[in-house]
Amino acid sequence: PDVTKAKEKDFRATFEIKGKALYPQMKILFAMMREILMESRLDDEKRLKEILAMLKSRLQMSFQSSGHTTSALRALSYGSPLSKFKDDTDGIGFYEVVRGIEEHFEEKKAELIQNLKQLSRQIFRVDNVMISYTSSEDGLTPIEAAFREIKDTLYPELDGEETPCVLHCRKRNEGFKTSSKVQYVARVGNFIDHGAQYHGALQILKVILSYDYLWQNVRVKGGAYGCMSNFNRIGEGYLISYRDPNLKKTMEVYEGVVDYLKNFTVDERDMTKYIIGTISNIDRPMNPAAKGDRSMNLYMNHVSQEMIRTERSQILHAAQEDIRALAAVVEAMLKAEQICVIGSEEKIEEEKEMFLEVKTLF
């Protein structure tokens, strides 16, 4: 996963291996992790080719079922090094790499094996490891010894300083053609880059847009299967549609969010319902694994208890004027003019003047 400083846009990429086990099987779990990290055969050409074909197929299936999140991530990658890294490791950018290697495996297999071995030595180092462990007090006793066994088998520290990886972003505004007859339409941007600030009421806005404006205009009137939005602490925001028969019409709906918010008026009962809906999303019951993931993510992303309390207070005390004030945030997001659409060849060709690049996805 990525690790982002919540008040900044710096990020550190991490490689994660995780598992669950009953207490008597903890030694077996850690032994399996150690074997996977340190003893995997990275030079098995036959197996590598099989994995590449499997990855290519799975990514294509993912783009068809989750094209809305894929297009949003791709659009965000035009202006965010963090999102570009995500796209390069789990999005369209990654798919293009996998496809290129799989289709020219004989020419590229030696370089692939060399890169995998080099990455393993750089990542699985004794000075580069962190563990997050969730259990009852009874389960804490064996963890130190088990962790020490893994740590003792990792690669040694690297000599000299590491060279930072610099990711270059550029606006591409792509339309990706597929055999599908529906579109996944994304409009994104970083509102902090364009002068706005994060506020807890943006979490309420997600609920309002999903159940009112976007629902009525994209789903009910437009015929899309779904629509959603998101806004995070580092300023990234998006508006997306799911299995949408439209393209240009949906983009026009996104542009209308600003005027909708400027004129936002509801009665106190509806406002309370929006707040309750927002809090219910935040206060979901969590099993131990979910609690462990959340605690690690908050720690690694430098999200303090004070930041959580502030956001919660802003949500609970939000009024209609706070929602109307968010028009400036959405307007700032739209100023980025970053779009990406995955959809039918016919629809994308019909609106090709909207894009900087039009290409076939698969």
Region roles according to the model:
Residues 31-34, 197-209, 218:
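Active/ligand-binding-proximal structured segments within catalytic/core domains
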